[in-house]
Amino acid sequence: MPIGVPKVPFRSPGEGDTSWVDIYNRLYRERLFFLGQDVDTEISNQLISLMIYLSIEKDTKDLYLFINSPGGWVISGMAIYDTMQFVRPDVQTICMGLAASIASFILVGGAITKRIAFPHARVMIHQPASSFYEAQTGEFILEAEELLKLRETITRVYVQRTGKPIWVVSEDMERDVFMSATEAQAHGIVDLVAVQ
């Protein structure tokens, strides 16, 4: 039986009364975000707006993005990544559970030295995919060209942020490569594995 989103007490600075807010609202106020679903336009826009708002509010205090996601839409994920690079505060990324596909791209986008994986977390990288079987030939060719550009961009970012040679990253992206937290650290996707 679902319990909904839990409520927690919160007292605004300078106010005497405590109010009850949903737990995510409370955590956002502490600069903690959660990506716990497929990456799509809606969650992407929510995370982007929170990062921008909180970076304007205080640009010297780190933001924390906790990730447990199977991936999702490439463009929406790239928008989150770009925002993480754009905002002034460092964005620390923490993988808890799974960071697969575009979610691993978001994970690697955290501030270098501030990318963490929980001990039993899993990370998966692969190349971007599409559903060609429904497309007309002309659309198929255009979509294939766009996918190739996206793959080149994603590969370039992984190379830059992991320090791995392009041939290693390209080879790994040919198929689904699942990694443990320590393997992701050896790959340069995360910097630290949280202590058990």
From Swiss-Prot:
Its catalytic activity? Hydrolysis of proteins to small peptides in the presence of ATP and magnesium. alpha-casein is the usual test substrate. In the absence of ATP, only oligopeptides shorter than five residues are hydrolyzed (such as succinyl-Leu-Tyr-|-NHMec, and Leu-Tyr-Leu-|-Tyr-Trp, in which cleavage of the -Tyr-|-Leu- and -Tyr-|-Trp bonds also occurs)
This protein's GO CC annotations = chloroplast stroma; endopeptidase Clp complex
Question: InterPro entries in the record, alphabetically?
Answer: ClpP, ClpP/crotonase-like_dom_sf, ClpP/TepA, ClpP_His_AS
Sorted alphabetically, the keyword list is: Chloroplast, Hydrolase, Plastid, Protease, Serine protease
SUPFAM superfamilies, from UniProt?
A: ClpP/crotonase
Is Transferase found in the keyword set? no
Supply the EC number(s): 3.4.21.92
One GO BP on record is: protein quality control for misfolded or incompletely synthesized proteins
Compartments it resides in: Plastid, Chloroplast stroma
Per the UniProt entry, the disulfide pairs are none
Which superkingdom heads the taxonomic lineage of this protein's source? Eukaryota
Named from the GO MF annotations, one term is:
ATP-dependent peptidase activity
Please list the residues that make up the active site.
Answer: 101 (nucleophile), 126
Q: What does this protein do?
A: Cleaves peptides in various proteins in a process that requires ATP hydrolysis. Has a chymotrypsin-like activity. Plays a major role in the degradation of misfolded proteins.
Similarity remark: Belongs to the peptidase S14 family.
Indicate the quaternary assembly: Component of the chloroplastic Clp protease core complex.
Q: What is this protein called?
A: ATP-dependent Clp protease proteolytic subunit
Record organism: Lepidium virginicum
Q: Which gene encodes it?
A: clpP
